[in-house]
């Protein structure tokens, strides 16, 4: 009996030993200091307060390349929200993240720096430490300073393909620094892909989804409440737009922080906001484009025409305009758009009011936030190049002035009754005013 007992004990020990070798347990820490490190072999990770996010090493299913990234710790479907070395992976399983000389570096087996924060400053009397915050932000700070304004470095300033609540996409008009999202190469390759989602300041800041030089989607300008072409549901989340000190920025906040939510650029070329459903253990799509509707596609209809969802012909000419090529228009080829029935004369010109619109592209627009709609109308009539005008901000009955001086492109009409859409006033010759 004793012999059998000993054999069982030995077999159990060997089984546990081999399991630990094949599947090493993950050890977590909350703060990384200069006396600690994360290595691939130790399977050690850095965890945020509340165990929401986790930072560590990972590799893709189809390769032996290793990356340093952040993912949701409690989400069963491993979902990465940030990758430090997405375009410079480790080629072997020997890698270390450590703080060295007040600078956390990601090193491969030959002590060559694969990724670094490039941080050179720090308070020698207060050692530098690194944390993953509850919102998923990986930060470096002096050990005696927890204030956000004192962060020495943060991953939120270097987004990859995902926007988290409180994370900003921004454009600095002074330095030209643009923080934007870039898609993955594929579902199993986190390197930089073909699609980007960025804020273009132009006359009125707007978001563009693009693939190289090709524009795929335009959000519409900020109307004081939201970007006119972006869905917004105050029950789940709401948008925040910041414009100050030569810098424009956008972020979203959750109305209930117990929900996990993310906005990301897909490797297949669309923008999607998802929320995690713990009951079904699945990500639910809150909205996605340009998949939701053909009207989301950039310039789905040509000049001086607008897109309408759920109609037999999605493209319609503005009042006072006719298809530039009737035969193509009848064949549902709308790229040529529409042309005026009557040329503008400057004398007797007026306007047709188009309600609930996504404003046309603002590349050639003139913006004056100091005047109202009446003065805006006068300025448009006095400018022979003016083709349309609108309020810049729909709050408080409408303020500011946007004057379009080029062709009206990429417009869309929304459902009647929308409370946060804009009206567009298109200039017409007297003969075409109804």
Swiss-Prot record:
SMART domains in the cross-refs: B_lectin (SM00108), PAN_AP (SM00473)
Highest taxon listed in the record's lineage: Eukaryota
SUPFAM superfamilies to which the protein is assigned, alphabetical: alpha-D-mannose-specific plant lectins
Cysteine-cysteine disulfides: 376-401, 384-386
Carbohydrate attachment residues: 43, 61, 111, 118, 256, 310, 385
Residue ranges constituting the PAN domain according to the UniProt record: 338-429
InterPro entries: Bulb-type_lectin_dom, Bulb-type_lectin_dom_sf, Pan_app, S_locus_glycoprot_dom, SLSG/EP1
Known function: Involved in sporophytic self-incompatibility system (the inability of flowering plants to achieve self-fertilization).
Occurrences of domain Bulb-type lectin (ranges): 31-153
High-level lineage: Eukaryota, Viridiplantae, Streptophyta, Embryophyta, Tracheophyta
Tissue: Stigma.
Protein name per its UniProtKB record: S-locus-specific glycoprotein S14
CDD domains for this protein: B_lectin, PAN_AP_plant
Keywords: Disulfide bond, Glycoprotein, Self-incompatibility, Signal
Organism of derivation: Brassica oleracea
Keyword match Disulfide bond: yes
Signal peptide: 1-28
One GO BP: rejection of self pollen
